[in-house]
Amino acid sequence: MNWSVFEGLLSGVNKYSTAFGRIWLSLVFVFRVLVYLVTAERVWGDDQKDFDCNTRQPGCTNVCYDEFFPVSHVRLWALQLILVTCPSLLVVMHVAYRKAREKKYQEKIGEGYLYPNPGKKRGGLWWTYVFSLSFKATIDIIFLYLFHAFYPRYTLPSMVKCHAEPCPNTVDCFIAKPSEKNIFIVFMVVTAVICILLNLVELIYLVIKRCSECAQLRRPPTAHAKNDPNWANSPSKEKDFLSCDLIFLGSDAHPPLLPDRPRAHVKKTIL
């Protein structure tokens, strides 16, 4: 694996994320991915070999293991982490697409721009980011449900009773390292729940922020705002211009009417 490429992808994801997104990224790659790579394979490496039943009936141990472990924890976690981390790369790819499109536009036109800031979450990029948050939270919720369906209460007992064929009768089977596995399972479940909460909080934050910005754009500017020197380049001025309000430089008063023309025929102009 080329770690420089991996580091570049992570830095790109971190660059275009909010504070909540950066916390989520650190939590996933430090407490989930690294812990999984270092610990999971060692704890579950020889799980089937260490699964022991008090019978010598050929095939009984394998059948009992398959009954109590239909899907390995390690493989479920691997699939979960892959599906959870991939949507974050969609944001980086969308920003790269915007930059490439902006570059082609500059080469063709030579002036102006398509995006004032290609990395700013506006338009399609905002929807891409919201989709990635929703997808990540949904994936974690689905996998938590699957784990609970396969292993109720997420914990493993030290001994299970099996009566599946070809076992001659009910046999006792013993799981290797149950306490160590339960600690690891609880850790992975708790970190997944925290990641879900972070995704939901970030999603709510983005929606509230976007609604607030839209409300500010629709709000008419006050006289104090129009007298502000920075108001000349603000969206409020553009809105006043589009609504055909007559604004004079340094004043919000209407001009005096010409004596020989009615007020309705005065051409409204912005200076």
UniProtKB/Swiss-Prot annotation:
Identification of the protein by name: Gap junction beta-5 protein
Mode of membrane association: Multi-pass membrane protein
Intervals, Extracellular compartment: 41-75, 148-183
Subcellular location field: Cell membrane; Cell junction, Gap junction
Cytoplasmic side, ranges: 1-20, 99-124, 207-271
Organism, scientific name: Mus musculus (Mouse)
Major site of localization recorded for this protein: membrane
InterPro entries associated with the record: Connexin, Connexin311, Connexin_CCC, Connexin_CS, Connexin_N, Connexin_N_sf
Keywords from the UniProt entry: Cell junction, Cell membrane, Gap junction, Membrane, Transmembrane, Transmembrane helix
Entry annotated with the keyword Signal: no
Name of one Pfam family that matches: Connexin
Domain of life, per lineage: Eukaryota
Transmembrane segments: 21-40, 76-98, 125-147, 184-206
Described purpose of this protein according to its UniProt entry: One gap junction consists of a cluster of closely packed pairs of transmembrane channels, the connexons, through which materials of low MW diffuse from one cell to a neighboring cell.
Tissue: Expressed in skin, much lower in testis.
